[in-house]
């Protein structure tokens, strides 16, 4: 019996082997070879675009094919992102597909289809990290020299290091969304394509950090990065040590070994962080929300390769995520967004006057008019005929008038939030699109200018819960969006449009006590920015409509208020003449704008904590490039426009006063919150860095106030000692606490770190930290 069972098992195994061989042979006989790589070295984040690098080789006959990536979505259908390609005989094509990653994206496949026949298939597995994770990318000849980045511990989330090549870098900015910082060292960047450079530039503007190294091979490293360099490098120079770098992080290491650095002249807008023997060693340049760093030495060579201080350099420069205002996080409040998308005349109830008049005429005709006509005709017995006829007639009229009220043309309610940055010619757009249909049908939604479409969380517009998005030369096309009679289906979109064009001469003047913002702002575009507002950390200034070529004067706004208060959203809405809870007299446009503003600025306690200077307003003339394929539409366009301004800095005083309103922060609390009503076990950390480039030569004093109703003995506050690299407990006062030996607790870049601790069993409402730093630039 055992021998018999063994023979059966052997026979089954042979059949399986033969079938597997046949499958491989069938795939080979198609002449199609498909390879695919998901993410950045396999790394990705949820609710962000996932780049899939695809290579297709055709060794057979000419082929018209569709290459697509697909996965099973939360609704039980298939989400498919594809592109139609021509594959001539003996051809090879390489390109990126972009898949919107959700919590359901775990296993997906990349396939090549000819008609409905699958010619090749690759199965891929991904495990996308949460959005608060930190992803470092390294493009280097020796990636292992930067493995120390794995040891950096951000305040929240995990750290992941991706080893990349030039070819791995996506050609669209959306594909860079998961990446927080990129290190480029000793590789030929001249291989970067124009599309990759544009994507890199937009990624930096949207908050990415680029770290470029120098050293002996600086020419290779900078070959394709001329437009990104804070320094115009011209030659190398020998230095007899890097003591200034150790002093920058208050490290006791000598770093007295000689090394070679790549020297040059500063570009406009660049500032020196570290200078060695008169040569800029570490330089930074702000671009939008992000930063570019140039490090003139080579960290992969001695003495830096043996120096532990490089970890702190990376931690200080790269671990602190680029701060962005809440509207730039591409996240909308879903309730307010739905309200804004449904705010159109066709979905509003008919006027009460219209309804009353209609009912009045109906009652009058069916009753008195019908009676007097039949009486005059002396044919009262016909009432049993005329009444039903009149009822049917009025019912038909009601149906026709209702159909006319809904209209006969589909409507696209396009809500766009545009974010521009000074010095960048493109503005990022996050859009919500509501597709309204007067009848039950399906549409193909298409975009221009390389806009990408993605499903919203509560999207029910998919035909059979399937999502089919096809990439083309101009943008994307979303197939079979089903809309019910008088219904609205919502879709998300991302892309870029030309920036508005704003010129200014704003100056931040540092005085002994006050830091003032003043100057002029000019609209150099052909569009009117309506209800413009200048937003600063402490207040907002209504500017009214900013017409083409119009100029507004800004007169001495104080930026360093001693007790800064968050920007009040309801106050901005009131300034714009909008209401959080619309009144019956509000127009449909006012309701739509109010809801969209609240969707774009979701906030806790009705307030926004901001740093930086922004110009905001409404645009009527620039729509998001989204329409319906082969279908005329009636568009409703609402664009909320923001531009981050970069005022110049005038350091007039020998001593300056910096307050918390001039700082970005990063918190270990969930959601990067600054306040807490329940201190977690072990406490939490808040890390502050200046939002305006400032470098301190000396610190005179540091004072802070903890906004809390709890007694000082209930809370423990510690400050990070940059010299001993430890947390030091600070004795709290009831009101203002003066910090002893303040220079130890302030980094050379003005950074300050607080740690708040207390019993997790007590109710301790820490609402914020206000501090005042007196220093010498």
Annotate each language-model stretch with its function.
Residues 9-19:
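Bacterial N-terminal signal peptides
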Residues 48, 105-188, 216, 220, ...:
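Aromatic-Pro/Gly-enriched surface loop or interdomain linker
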Residues 433-587:
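Soluble catalytic regions of membrane-associated enzymes that act on cell-envelope
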Residues 1-10:
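Bacterial N-terminal signal peptides that target proteins for export
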Residues 22-26:
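Sec/Tat signal peptide C-region and signal peptidase I cleavage site
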Residues 176-223, 286-295:
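Short alpha-beta junction capping motif
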Residues 27-75, 81-98, 102-104, 108, ...:
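Extracellular ligand-binding/catalytic regions of CAZymes and related secreted enzymes
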Residues 209-284, 290-295:
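An acidic, glycine-rich "communication" segment
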């Amino acid at each position: 019996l055992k021998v018999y069972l063994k023979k059966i098992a052997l026979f089954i195994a042979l059949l399986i082997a033969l079938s597997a061989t046949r499958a491989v042979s069938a795939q080979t006989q198609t002449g199609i070879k498909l390879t695919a790589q998901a993410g950045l070295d396999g790394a990705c984040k949820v609710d962000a675009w996932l780049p899939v690098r695809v290579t297709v080789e055709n060794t057979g006959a000419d082929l018209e094919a569709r290459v697509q990536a697909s996965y099973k979505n939360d609704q039980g259908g298939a989400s498919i992102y594809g592109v139609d390609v021509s594959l001539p005989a003996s051809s090879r094509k390489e390109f990126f597909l972009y898949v919107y990653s959700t919590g359901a994206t775990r296993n997906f496949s990349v396939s090549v289809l000819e008609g409905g026949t699958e010619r090749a298939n690759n199965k891929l597995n991904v495990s996308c990290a949460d959005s608060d994770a930190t992803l470092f990318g390294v493009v280097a000849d020796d990636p292992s020299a930067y493995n120390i980045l794995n040891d950096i511990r951000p305040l929240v989330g995990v750290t992941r290091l991706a080893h990349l090549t030039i070819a791995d870098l996506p050609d669209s900015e959306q594909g860079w969304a998961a990446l927080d910082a990129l290190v480029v060292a000793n590789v030929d960047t001249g291989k970067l394509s124009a599309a990759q450079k544009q994507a890199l530039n937009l990624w930096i503007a949207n908050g990415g950090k680029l770290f470029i190294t120098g050293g002996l091979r600086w020419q290779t490293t900078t070959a394709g990065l001329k437009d990104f360099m804070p320094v115009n490098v011209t030659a190398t120079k020998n230095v007899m040590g890097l003591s200034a770098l150790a002093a920058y992080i208050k490290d006791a290491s000598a770093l007295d070994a000689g090394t070679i650095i790549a020297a040059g002249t500063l570009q406009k807008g660049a500032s020196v962080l570290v200078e060695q023997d008169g040569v800029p060693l570490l330089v930074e340049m702000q671009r939008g929300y992000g930063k570019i760093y140039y490090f003139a030495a080579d960290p992969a060579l001695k003495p830096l390769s043996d120096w532990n201080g490089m970890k702190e350099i990376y931690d200080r420069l790269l671990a602190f995520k680029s701060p962005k205002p809440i509207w730039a996080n591409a996240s909308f409040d879903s309730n307010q967004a739905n309200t804004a998308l449904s705010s159109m005349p066709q979905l509003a109830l008919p006027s009460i006057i219209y309804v009353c008049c209609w009912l009045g005429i109906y009652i009058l005709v069916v009753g008195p008019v019908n009676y007097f006509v039949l009486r005059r005709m002396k044919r009262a017995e016909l009432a049993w005929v005329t009444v039903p006829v009149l009822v049917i007639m009025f019912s038909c009229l009601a149906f026709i008038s209702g159909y006319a009220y809904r209209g006969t043309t589909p409507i696209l309610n396009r809500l766009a939030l545009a974010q521009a940055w000074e010095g960048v010619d493109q503005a990022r757009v996050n859009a919500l699109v509501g597709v309204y249909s007067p009848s039950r049908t399906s549409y193909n939604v298409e975009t221009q200018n390389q806009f990408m479409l993605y499903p919203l969380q509560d999207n029910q517009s998919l035909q059979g819960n399937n999502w089919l998005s096809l990439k083309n030369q101009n943008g994307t096309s979303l197939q079979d969006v089903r809309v019910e009679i008088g219904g609205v289906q919502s879709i998300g979109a991302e892309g870029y449009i030309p920036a508005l064009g704003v010129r200014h001469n704003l100056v931040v003047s540092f005085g002994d006590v006050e830091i003032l913002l003043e100057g002029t702002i000019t609209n150099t575009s052909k569009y009117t920015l309506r209800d413009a507002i200048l937003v600063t950390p402490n207040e907002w200034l209504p500017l009214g409509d900013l017409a083409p070529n119009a100029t507004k004067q800004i007169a001495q706004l104080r930026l360093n208020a001693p007790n800064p208060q968050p920007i009040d959203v309801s106050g901005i809405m009131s300034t714009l003449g909008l209401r959080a809870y619309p009144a019956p007299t509000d127009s449909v446009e006012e309701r739509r704008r109010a809801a969209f503003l609240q969707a774009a600025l979701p906030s806790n306690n009705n307030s926004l904590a901001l740093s930086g200077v922004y110009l905001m307003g409404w645009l009527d003339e620039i729509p998001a490039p989204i329409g319906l394929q082969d279908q005329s539409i009636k568009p409703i366009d609402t664009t909320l426009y923001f531009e981050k301004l970069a005022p110049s800095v005038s350091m007039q005083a020998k001593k300056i006063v910096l307050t918390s309103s001039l700082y970005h922060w990063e918190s270990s609390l969930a959601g990067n919150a600054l306040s807490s009503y329940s201190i977690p076990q072990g406490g939490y950390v808040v890390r502050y860095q200046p939002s305006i480039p400032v470098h301190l030569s000396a610190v005179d004093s540091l004072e802070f106030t903890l906004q809390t109703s709890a007694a000082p003995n209930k809370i423990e506050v510690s400050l990070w000692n940059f010299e001993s690299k430890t947390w030091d407990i600070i004795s709290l006062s009831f009101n203002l606490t003066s910090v002893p030996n303040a220079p130890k607790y302030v980094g050379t870049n003005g950074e300050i770190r607080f740690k708040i601790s207390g019993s997790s069993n007590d109710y301790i409402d820490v609402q914020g930290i206000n501090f005042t730093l007196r220093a010498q630039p």
